[in-house]
Amino acid sequence: MQTRTAQILVSLLFLTTAISSCDKKEVSPWNQMTEVNNQIVPSVFPERSFVITDYHDVKDTLYTNAINRAITICSEQGGGKVIIPDGEFLTAPIRLKSNVNLHLSDSTVLKFTTDPFFFDLVQTRIEGIDCYNISPLIYAYGETNIAITGNGVMDGQADSSNWFSENRIRGIVQEDGKKINEKTLLYEMKEDSIPFKERVFMRENGIRPQFINLYKCKNILLEGFTLNRSPFWLIHPLLSENITVRKVKMQSHGYNNDGCDPESCRNVLIEDCDFDTGDDCIAIKSGRDEDGRYWNIPSENIIVRHCRMKDGHAGVAIGSEVTGGCRNVWVENCTMDSPELDRIIRIKSNAMRGGEVENIFIRNIRVGECKESILGFELKYWHVDDGPYLPYFHNIHLENITSKKSQYVLHLDGFEDKIQARDIFVKDCTFDGVMKPKINKVTGVENIHFENVTVNGQDFKGV
């Protein structure tokens, strides 16, 4: 209740300030983006270097001990750069610590074992649900001033012989004949209100882990490297702030292979990255159902710019685990182009997850082609249209978007009997090659504005 009251007071203060300044000059949301950008300051580190090969025991087939020991010593001595030199190295999960820049040299290939025996238990969140699970390939909890940099490659080695085996994806047959996998078990634990400390998935039944999971961390820099073959989401900052993800290449087409998913994070910059993924390229999240309401922390002040998206379920998505809300997102100067890219912008939730999504600004997007729609809303995601926690999407702006090929422009799937999405503005957009221009589904949405919009060369006034 106190948190909600504080949010209302902050909103009133913002409104009062805005009203008092109306006579002077209208504040552009893109000027606000500049202010947020100025608050996102990349991490800096002392000029100290620790090379992992100096800590390696030749008896070890894995470099895990060498890497983690170098990280610990570096952190204890005040920080610096832990260098993984040119060459190929095999490791188990790595634990990042404060004031450490884990640096991959230009010709480094860092491979991660797929043997669950080497994966310790850590606190994390899987698809918005809190639990204890086997460690992500790179993990940090409560650390400050951390980085992964360099032009090397990190390979999770996930394929159908390990993380994507039939048993892990489809599940195994239980004694009662029911076929279930570990992720579904976690869903059931959440539905049964089992406390998160009892939602434990050990080595023998661990849920596929994220590649990089940075939990409750501050001042994060991820720059330059390539990620391949992840078991699950690739980059997952969680309950963290002041994050820069720059010039990272994400190439991974496995199940649930989202590219970058900031969850309940504040002040995030994602720029000049390449996405070629098996799920959403970027998906902004803030918890799911009861767990999301317990934390009640939105994702806010997120900037995406100068990125390139190929395959994926969406170029930029918000949700579906967005119970804590999402506000103040800017996406600009991106290119998105693939027959296997489903949607350009996608916002999704349902009546059990809820969440308020507001102040979303998109401009200067070049689309070669996408499989379905330019803008998609799903307020009944997973066909859940009945529940006490209605999502609410509003103040969404699209400007200067061009597309050469899509099935349709809009697919705004709201509730049949209520309005839970409004104030959508589409301006200065050109949509060509629209195969079904008259099948723009708009349900449960009001106050949609079109200005200088053409579809297949014809002026488009509305739906």
Residue ranges and their predicted role:
Residues 79, 90-93, 113-114, 134-135, ...:
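Short glycine/acidic-rich loop motifs that flank beta-strands on beta-rich extracellular proteins
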